[in-house]
């Protein structure tokens, strides 16, 4: 995801 840099 864009909000969480950790996962897509």
Curated annotation (Swiss-Prot):
Is this entry keyworded Nucleotide-binding?
A: no
Task: Name the residues that span the membrane.
Answer: none
PTMs? The N-terminus is blocked.
Q: Which domain of life is it from?
A: Eukaryota
Q: What UniProt keywords apply to this chain's record, in alphabetical order? A: Allergen
Q: What else is known?
A: The MW of the complete protein is 65 kDa with a pI of 3.6.
The protein in question is named Allergen Fus s I3596*
Q: Which organism is it from?
A: Fusarium vanettenii (Neocosmospora pisi)
């Amino acid at each position: 995801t864009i909000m969480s840099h950790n996962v897509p």
